[in-house]
Each structure stands twice: as C-alpha cells, then as structure tokens.
C-alpha cells in the first residue's frame, strides 16, 4: 500500500531475526512511521481530490479550447464563404445595377441641367429686355420731361399774353358798360 517504502506486517509485530531492545523500539517507531505514511497516502487518495480535479480541469480546458477552436473555425469558414459569395455574386450585381442606374440618373441630371440652363438663359434674356425697355422708357420720359420743361416758358408766355388780352377786353367791356350805365343814369 505504501508508495515505495517497506511494508510491515499487520499487528505491529517485530521483524524476524529478533533484535535487541533498542532495535525493537526502533522497529516500533519505524512501523509507526510507515503506518502514518500509509494513512497519509490513504487520506490523500480518498479525501484529497486536487490531482483529480486538476486533471479534470486540464481535460475540460483542453476540450473547451478544441470545441471553441472548432466553433471559431466554423464561424471563420462561414465568414469566408459569405465574403466569397459577396465578392463573386452580390458585388457584381450591385456594380451592374449601379452602373445602369447611375447612367440613367446621369442622363436625367444632364437633361435637368440643360433645362435649367435654358430657363436661366431665357430669364436673363427676359430681364435684359425688360431692363433695356425700362432704360429706353426712362430715357423717353426724360426727353418728354425736358421738352415739357422747355415748352413751359413759351406756354406761360402765351397764357400770360392771353390773360393780358382777356384783361384788356374785360376792361374795355367794363368801360363800355360804365359808359352805358352812365347814359342810363342821366335820365
């Protein structure tokens, strides 16, 4: 039962060959030592589970790492397949769709840009015509105003002359009326 020591017979009998008293006391002490050693081994085998637990722990960690490694390998393989499918199928489809759509969008944008440029050009031409018309109209009004202001002294002179003539006629008329009235008042 002991690991590497000598076994003593059960019952603590002395080893054959007899011995002196000193030897018997040593033999008993040696036997007790062996018994204690055997009890320690029995205790460690029955009650000390550290080596077993350490072995089980190592085994569990090894299995976990293997399974984890396999699981990670499966995940990496799935990712690799997904990336391969994306590169082989999805990206070319997307690229072709984008090319078709982008060319249509580019054509539409170009047409819209041309329309906007034409509208802007028409608007600028209309504004220029309107501005030219306003400038011409303003010049015409200024010429008319200048002519009007130039004619004013002549018209004023004419009006003043007509007024003076009308006043003279009225004076003459009132003078005649006074004469006629004076004729009638003498009666």
Swiss-Prot record:
GO terms, biological process: anterograde axonal transport; anterograde synaptic vesicle transport; endosome to melanosome transport; melanosome organization; melanosome transport; neuron projection development; otolith morphogenesis; positive regulation of pigment cell differentiation
Subunit structure: Interacts with BLOC1S4, DTNBP1/BLOC1S7 and PI4K2A. Component of the biogenesis of lysosome-related organelles complex 1 (BLOC-1) composed of BLOC1S1, BLOC1S2, BLOC1S3, BLOC1S4, BLOC1S5, BLOC1S6, DTNBP1/BLOC1S7 and SNAPIN/BLOC1S8. Octamer composed of one copy each BLOC1S1, BLOC1S2, BLOC1S3, BLOC1S4, BLOC1S5, BLOC1S6, DTNBP1/BLOC1S7 and SNAPIN/BLOC1S8. The BLOC-1 complex associates with the AP-3 protein complex and membrane protein cargos. Interacts with BLOC1S6.
Annotated region described as Disordered, given as residue ranges: 1-26
Coiled coil: 154-186
Protein name: Biogenesis of lysosome-related organelles complex 1 subunit 5
Entry keyword Protein biosynthesis: no
Entry function: Component of the BLOC-1 complex, a complex that is required for normal biogenesis of lysosome-related organelles (LRO), such as platelet dense granules and melanosomes. In concert with the AP-3 complex, the BLOC-1 complex is required to target membrane protein cargos into vesicles assembled at cell bodies for delivery into neurites and nerve terminals. The BLOC-1 complex, in association with SNARE proteins, is also proposed to be involved in neurite extension. Plays a role in intracellular vesicle trafficking.
Residues that bear N-acetylserine: 2
Organism: Homo sapiens (Human)
């Amino acid at each position: 039962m002991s690991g590497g020591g000598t076994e003593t017979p059960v019952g603590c009998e002395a080893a054959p060959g007899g011995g002196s008293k000193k030897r018997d006391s040593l033999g008993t002490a040696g036997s007790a030592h062996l018994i204690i050693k055997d009890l320690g081994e029995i205790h460690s085998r029955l009650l000390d589970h550290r080596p077993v637990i350490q072995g089980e722990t190592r085994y569990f960690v090894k299995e976990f790492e293997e399974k984890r490694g396999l699981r990670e390998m499966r995940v990496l393989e799935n990712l690799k397949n997904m990336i391969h499918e994306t590169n082989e199928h999805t990206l070319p489809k997307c690229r072709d769709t984008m090319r078709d759509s982008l060319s249509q969008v580019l054509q539409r944008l170009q047409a819209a840009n041309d329309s906007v440029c034409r509208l802007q050009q028409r608007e600028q031409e209309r504004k220029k015509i309107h501005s030219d018309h306003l400038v011409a109209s303003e010049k015409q009004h200024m010429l008319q105003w200048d002519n009007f202001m130039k004619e004013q002294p002549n018209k004023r002179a004419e009006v003043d002359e007509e007024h003076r003539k009308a006043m003279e006629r009225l004076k003459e008329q009132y003078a005649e009326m006074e004469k006629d009235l004076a004729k009638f008042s003498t009666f």
